[in-house]
């Protein structure tokens, strides 16, 4: 039976270098290669729908011919991953690149055809770890393990940028104060470590997603933090001591605040983790200062 390997990783994470080690036994289908062949530019992003429709068809055809296939692309969209996997009948392996974004940015600058820091930061906002997607095996690959840090290191992000939430009346407290309040409450109530870690780090992505524009591009007075949970999840995932249960909570913690949560919850295989999300939401809401102005000391 044929074997299919899908890489997941942002630009500069070493996907292609790692995949090329297996070129003797697999047909490597590269999105960059297809872009250059079809449109003459590996950085072309204007034909993505057409491009991936062609790529997915070619992958399915190769597997139907009983050939082993490696799909080398960022593959950050869970929806697109699931769509392709549902059409493939073979052993399916995910290789997800566990490389800190700072390292990816540095590696990208060394490349002849750099995508740029802004593109990489946008990619992180779409990151999602492949829970319940149909893979038979998930391998975490870190070719730059010397740059990995324990998760506690990421608390230093609070000193790298303006800490104010700028979204009164929902938060008068700072971002770091909110996370500290959540963590303190979890420790006091003797929550398990996986849960306390999520409480401590769930909003670290806000330091990289703050904007004063809504999704329509209209300027707003209150700060927005669209997709911060995905950035938080990526930052935690690239720590050397990450675990998938904490990652699941961080990645999905905003779902309980939004419509459609119960419909999503019913589809999950691990209902204990879904209940963790429900409980997490209570901490997230309770550990805010919403009635009086908060002054930084």
Positions of the model-derived regions?
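Pre-Walker A (Motif I) flank of P-loop NTPase domains
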Residues: 1-5, 66-67
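Conserved GTP-binding G-domain of TRAFAC-class P-loop NTPases and closely related GTPase folds
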Residues: 4-8, 103-150
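Conserved glycine(s) of the Walker
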Residues: 14
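Conserved substrate/cofactor phosphate-moiety recognition/catalytic segment
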Residues: 17-67
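Acidic, metal-coordinating catalytic cores used for nucleic-acid/nucleotide bond scission
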Residues: 71-81
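Conserved phosphate-donor/acceptor-positioning beta-strand/loop module used by diverse small-molecule
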Residues: 90-104
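Active-site flanking loop/helix segments enriched in acidic
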Residues: 151-183, 211-220
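Divalent metal-dependent catalytic cores for phosphoryl transfer on phosphate-bearing substrates
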Residues: 182, 186-292
């Amino acid at each position: 039976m044929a074997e299919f390997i899908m890489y997941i990783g942002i630009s500069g994470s070493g996907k292609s270098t790692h995949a090329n080690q297996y070129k003797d036994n697999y047909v490597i289908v590269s999105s960059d290669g297809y872009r250059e062949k079809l449109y003459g530019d590996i950085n072309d992003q204007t034909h993505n729908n057409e491009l991936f429709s062609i790529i997915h068809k070619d992958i399915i055809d190769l597997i139907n011919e009983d050939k082993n296939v490696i799909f080398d692309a960022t593959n950050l969209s869970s929806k697109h991953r699931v769509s392709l996997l549902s059409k493939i009948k073979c052993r399916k392996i995910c290789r997800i690149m566990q490389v800190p974004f700072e390292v990816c940015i540095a590696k990208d600058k060394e490349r002849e055809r750099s995508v740029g820091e802004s593109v990489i930061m946008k990619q992180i906002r779409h990151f999602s770890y492949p829970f319940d997607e149909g893979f038979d095996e998930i391998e975490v690959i870190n070719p730059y393990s010397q740059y990995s840090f324990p998760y506690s290191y990421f608390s230093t992000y609070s000193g790298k940028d303006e800490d104010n939430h700028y979204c009164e009346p929902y938060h008068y407290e700072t971002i770091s104060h909110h996370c500290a309040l959540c963590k303190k409450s979890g420790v006091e109530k003797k929550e398990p470590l996986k849960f306390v870690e999520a409480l401590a780090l769930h909003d670290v992505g806000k330091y990289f997603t703050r904007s004063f524009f809504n999704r329509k591009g209209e300027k707003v007075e209150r700060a927005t933090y669209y997709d911060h949970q995905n950035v938080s999840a990526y930052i935690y995932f690239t720590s050397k001591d990450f675990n998938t249960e904490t990652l699941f909570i961080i990645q999905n913690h905003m779902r309980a605040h939004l419509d459609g949560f119960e419909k999503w919850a019913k589809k999950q295989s691990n209902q204990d983790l879904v209940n963790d999300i429900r409980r997490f939401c209570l901490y997230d809401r309770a550990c805010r200062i919403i009635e009086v102005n908060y002054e930084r000391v």
